[in-house]
Structure formats: structure tokens, C-alpha cells
Amino acid sequence: MSTRELVVLGTASQAPTRTRNHNGYVLRWDDEVILFDPGEGSQRQLLYSSVTATDLTRICVTHFHGDHCLGLPGTIQRLSLDRVPHPVAVHFPAGGADYFTRLRYASSFHETAELAVMPIDTDGQQIAVRNGTLEARRLRHPIETYGYRLVEPDGCRMLPERLSAHGIAGPAVGELLRVGHLDVNGRRVTRAEVSAPRPGQRFAFVMDTGLCDAVYALAEHADLLVIESTFLASETALAAEVGHLTAAQAARVATESGVRRLVLTHFSQRYPDLSRFAAEAREHFTGDLVIAEELMTVGIPPRRVPSAG
């Protein structure tokens, strides 16, 4: 059975704390296992999680500030150490290619893993992945930064009562689904007549950024939104100055974008009590709210089921 879930490796921002590792997030999306923003210590955090290096199929880096990329050397070397048999795609801002090369070859090692290096050089760039499309959008931060959005294509679900009414059963259902129409007793029945739309699932990953149109574009109708909330509202001016969000801002984005499950993360070390983030976000968001914790697993909500009409 396919699995779609987020595994949190770390939740700290610029500086880790005794209880918070640098950033690191793994998205299980069926056969795709994507590591986002491996900060310092990510390789060790993987050992404590349900994810192994050999599971990884793709790495996505939003930008080259240390808390989002210093785990790359260890992770990349681990891919070779464990002799990962499949290519691992790597995406990052094209303007940071030199940083990536330095991190990739930060020390001597026997490289056996195959990396498919695919930099992001265009706002809105799309990459075909298994069971979806990965899109990158340029965010507002002091250095080149991209957020990522993974979208499953919309589909349809067959309605048993309508199939039965037309006398369609067995292999004929598969033919109708595949071809789009079926001739039954001298009448052509279309797939639309016996099915209802099934919206694809949507996942969004928004790290270091000030408010901008791209934040909303990434978050739009996301089933699961993972978004930075470095500061509380008392530091709104500072957040804007350094290109970050507050918990209140992240929560409002989620509400205005129709997000179903909101995961707040990337907390400043100045805040030992994360319950304040939950309280602030709850003032603006009534959906499913998660305050990320190390080694937490967060499921992607089931697909939306619209009315059959």
C-alpha cells in the first residue's frame, strides 16, 4: 500500500538547540522519498527515523544558508557508503551551484552513488516525478531561494450506483476508465456519466521567505503545508527585515489558501516554549494544526471527496 507522509528530522532555524536539530524533512510520496533541506546532523537524524539513505530518491534544497544545507556532505557520502543502487536527483537554486559543488566534495570519499544534478534556474520550473509534478517558485529572501510544491494529477472515482444503473460491471469498468466511453445496449456511456472528480493531493514546502505572491501560489489548496514560522508576531518587523515569517502570518496564508493541514517549523532559538506558536497560529487558522517536533511523522490527509452531484 502506498504511503504519503512527512517525517521531521529537525525544526531549528539558524542555530540548533539541545532539543531541536537543524532543519531536515523527508516526504514519502509513494515510491518517491524526497529529502528537503538537510541541515547539520540530518544523517544522524535519519538513523533515528524510519527512513534510510537507500530510501532516498530525490533531494530538494531551498537555498544555501547553512541550516538548510550543511547536512548535504554527510548525506551525499552516506549514499555512496550504502551503495544506493538508483540515481538520486538533486534540485537547488542554480545560482548556488558553486556552494553545492563545495558541499558535495567537502572531503575525500569514494563516490559510487549516482546523483542526477538538476538545478532550478526558472521561477515556476516544473519537474515530472512519480505520481505528480514538482514545481519550484522563487521566494523573497536575501539570497536565491525556492519553495517547492508537489501536485498529483486530478483523477476520477467510479460511482458503483451509476455503473450498476447502466449494467456495467467487471472488466467493462476498466475499459470504460481506460478508453473514456463504452457502448452498452446500443447507447454510448461516457466516463463522466458514471464517475465523480477526484482532486489530486497537494503538498507544499515553504521555507525562508517574507510574504510574497509565491508563498500563496505554493500553498494554494495544499493538503499539507510545511511552512517556516521563525518568529512570533511580536517580531513582525524583524521578520520582514530578514526575510522570514511569523506564526500568525503562516497561519493566515494557510487560511487564505484553503490549506487542510498546517505544519509550522523552523523556530528561532529565542523561543524555548513552542506552545506560543500554536496559540498564535490558532487565532488565524481553524484547520488541522501541527507544531513540528523532531522525528515526528505527519500524514497527508486523504484525498478530498467532492459531492458526486
From Swiss-Prot:
EC number: 3.1.26.11
Entry keyword set: Endonuclease, Hydrolase, Metal-binding, Nuclease, tRNA processing, Zinc
Residues that bind Zn(2+) 1: 63, 65, 141, 208
Record Gene3D superfamilies: Ribonuclease Z/Hydroxyacylglutathione hydrolase-like
Top-level taxon of the source organism: Bacteria
Family as reported in the entry's similarity comment: Belongs to the RNase Z family.
Designated name of the protein: Ribonuclease Z
